[in-house]
Amino acid sequence: MKKYKIYFLLFTIFSNTLISQNLADKKVLVVWGGWDGHKPELFANHVENWLIKEKADYKIINGLDAYDNYDELIKYDLIIQSVTMDEISKKQEENLLKAVLSGVGIAGAHGGLVDSFRKNTNYQFMIGGQWVAHPGNIIKYKVKMLEDELTSGLSDFEIVSEQYYMHYDPNVKIIAETKFNDEIYPWINNVVMPIAWKKMYGKGKVFFISIGHDPDEFMVYK
């Protein structure tokens, strides 16, 4: 099988999602925190290595204090978030949503973006979905790439990770998908679920990819 770095899928689409240009001199905010089980600090480290390579102007913040100041948030071109099962204050949520609405991009992977704040439906509306289950936990499954400018040149692949089952907005543009089988829950056999999507929230671009239960998945050859 031809070797293929999975993280290329994530980071290439991050870059293209930003402004369809390279990241050199663009301002990027990386926010990590929440549940330690998703290794958010490791995710932030992998992203930092990529941002250094891309010559981006970046800042990394541990915790939701990153969203305290709206005037600071709107200075960024892109926010990359890895925060799972945390609680965001009303003001922090308002600042984040307003910043993206005004044109700041937001991107992330797995529960770090789509299971961040379970009580906050306005946040979920912005992102485009919410995790609800991962039948079978860590399993092998196929990822099918769909035709899109962001996936040009990318091939279908298999991965061992959590296969996310989500409630998602029909308005998202799905660019990669997976199909469930009947081994765990027979009633979801052949259900097709997004693996990655893009959408707009006001002027802001949103990108999500569901792989990445362990951030090292992005560094593994398949």
Give the ranges of each region predicted by the language model.
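Helical hinge/lid and interdomain linker segments adjacent to catalytic or ligand-binding clefts
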Residues: 21-31, 35-114
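Short, flexible, glycine/charge-rich loop motifs used to bind or transfer phosphoryl groups or to couple energy/partner
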Residues: 18-21, 68-71, 163-165, 196-197
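Catalytic beta-strand/loop cores that center a nucleophilic Ser/Cys/Thr
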Residues: 51-54, 75, 129-208
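C-terminal catalytic histidine-bearing segment of alpha/beta-hydrolase fold enzymes
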Residues: 70-71, 206, 218
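Alpha-helix N-cap/helix-start motif
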Residues: 40, 89, 116-119, 186, ...
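A short acidic/glycine-rich loop-to-helix N-cap element
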Residues: 213-222
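Bacterial Sec-dependent N-terminal signal peptides
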Residues: 1-23
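A glycine-rich, often tryptophan-bearing local segment used as a flexible ligand/cofactor-contacting loop or short
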Residues: 86-153
